[in-house]
Structures are given as structure tokens and as C-alpha cells.
């Protein structure tokens, strides 16, 4: 993937730099940041620019605001970043308004300006070129370090790159690391290569499953999506999550796996309950015996032992999607145990963003994993073999 223009290929000295970051961090009801991994991941690129005598303008989105509201302000991000960098962060009140433009114009070498939430501008998600042009006009160099949004053709990710030539745009360190990791994983995995796929829906992972099959040695399917596969095999799954319209696709994946010699593992028992709540009664049952009206909400202890055995000889593990409804304590055990087993082994372990990263953080295993992707959707699309708009825009034309 070395045909992507890197920040290291660009002469940054004393220039004004725009860095598109991904500061889309989780917050509690009081807007306190509960996990600042994404902010910390951006620091190497920011420091590199400062070390080159640059002035730096940072931009990100946060959540999906319908209108401008303090709930989605990047103010808490600027405070956390200031603490992590031990440096003042100048906060703009807007994005391309008078406040941002004046502060951008007066920005001196070594100073950092953070623009307000990009999605307060309606044009951002529409890939609006006028917004992109306004943003581009503030700086001399554009750096994308926001892997988590590279699968979206948005104004600050794709349209903006049209206003910079190859000597003035490139990928930051985090973005490069993410892309290199994903492409090596797909092209040269150490074997046995095991994919552990979970989460609630088959529909979201269908393309990734299809693309992974020819590349993996074993495939573990857990989480809510496992029930569509179990149903396809003729099991009675009670009230468990089912995507009826995908039964045929599930069957195709199982057949394709068989033909390719891939060993596919599904849960053999589940934690069943009549309702998805902390107070509901629960019991462990084999998948053949899910009671009528009950639903499977986590993998059971026998499945945990089986999956542990399956990954015991793995050299590479790619994990995307929890094994159950991990947000509810009593249905989180399967996911937490999987996290422990994956992190304890000697395999190269790659965790695909989003919910899975939250599970790993909750299990206290983050430091033991080889690599935790900062982008759920983007990491899935790379595994699906798709070209991400934000990455394509940074390719060197000579190599096309």
C-alpha cells in the first residue's frame, strides 16, 4: 500500500497544516469522555507537525448532530487534548465562520487550533466542494489521520483533497498504520489464520465474510448473527435475533466454506433469557434446546471452551463483533472471555474497532492485543477488499 502519499514525503517545514482527525469519542451523560483512545492515537502526527515548526489546524466530527448543539461540541475534546499534549489548544467557535478564519489567519508556528464539530456544517456529510474549498483555503498542507471516516466520501475527507497537489497532501501516521495492518493481514497472514466474527447482524458483515472465506483457515461465528446460521442449519432458535431474508446467504457461506476447506464454528450452547434485560431470568442451554419464546443473548460456557480450543493454535486472529449483548453485564461473559483468550495467546491479534474495541477495553486486554483498529466500518470495508474514498484520494497518481 506504499503508493499512498505519506506525511513523511511532504516538506512540512514551517507550513500551516490541516489535520483531519477522528475525535468521535464516547461520552457519558455529563459529556465526560469515557474513552480517549482516538484522541491519543492522533498525537504522533500532531507532534511531528509541531516538531517541524508548523502551525496546526485540527478538525473532526463528533456524533451525528441534527443541528448545532453544545451536546456535540468539541470543547471536551480540546480540554482532553490540551492535557495529553500539555499545551494550550485554541478553540474556534465555528468551522468556516469569522471566528475560525480569524484564528486560523493569526495562528503562529507551534500553535494548535481546533475547529468546532465539522458536522455542524450541513455540507460536510454531502461532500460539498464549497465547504472543502473554504477549509482548504486556511492552510498549505492537508493530512488525513482519520481512518475511522475514510470509508465516507465527506467534505473534509474526500472533496478537500482536490484543492491540494501531491506535494501538499498525505496520510498521517495512524492512517498509514491502519492501512498497512489491514493489507498485510489480508495478503500475508501467518497461519493458521482465524477470523472471529460476531455482532448482531449478518447483513453488516456479509461482504466481509464472503471476502474472508478464501483467506482464513477457520471461522468462528458468534453474537446475534450466529442465530441466522443456526436457523439455516435447521435449529429452532426461539425468539433469538433472525434475519429471515439472509437464510439463503448464510447457507451459501456455510457451503462455500466447506468447499474451500475452511472450518466454520458456531455456538454449541447459549445464555438464554425471555427478555433482553439485566433482571430477566437466564439459563445455559444447548442450541438444540432454546425454549419457545426465549432468546439467546450470549454464547454459553461450552461454546467458550470450544472457541478457546479453536484459536489455541492460531498465528493470526482477526476479531470483529462481540459474542453477545455485552452492554448488559449478565450477557457479557462470552465476549469478555473471548477477549482474554485472544489476548493471552501468541497470535497476532487484530481487533476491528467499534463495539469490539469497547469489549477489549472493558476486559482490560487492550495492551495485550497486537493492534486495535480505530474504525469499525472502515476496517470492515478494507477487509471486504474495498477502496476507501479517503484513502484513494491520497494515492500517488504515478502508481495508478
Swiss-Prot record:
Example GO molecular function term? ATP binding
Alphabetical keyword list:
ATP-binding, Cytoplasm, Glycolysis, Kinase, Nucleotide-binding, Transferase
Report what the protein is called.
Phosphoglycerate kinase
Describe the family membership recorded for this protein in Swiss-Prot or TrEMBL: Belongs to the phosphoglycerate kinase family.
The pathway it acts in is: Carbohydrate degradation; glycolysis; pyruvate from D-glyceraldehyde 3-phosphate: step 2/5
TM stretches of this protein: none
Q: What's the short name of a Pfam family annotated to this entry?
A: PGK
**What HAMAP family does the record tag this protein with?**
Phosphoglyc_kinase
What Gene Ontology terms describe where this protein resides (cellular component)?
cytosol
Q: Where in the cell is it found?
A: Cytoplasm
| Gene that this polypeptide is encoded by | pgk
Q: How does it assemble?
A: Monomer.
- Identify which top EC class this enzyme belongs to: transferase
Q: Which reaction does it catalyse?
A: (2R)-3-phosphoglycerate + ATP = (2R)-3-phospho-glyceroyl phosphate + ADP
Entry annotated with the keyword Transferase: yes
E.C. number(s) listed in UniProt: 2.7.2.3
Q: Where does substrate bind?
A: 22-24, 38, 61-64, 119, 152
**Organism, per UniProt?**
Campylobacter jejuni subsp. doylei (strain ATCC BAA-1458 / RM4099 / 269.97)
Amino acids binding ATP: 205, 296, 327, 353-356
Q: Name one GO biological process term.
A: glycolytic process
Q: Which Gene3D superfamilies match?
A: Phosphoglycerate kinase, N-terminal domain
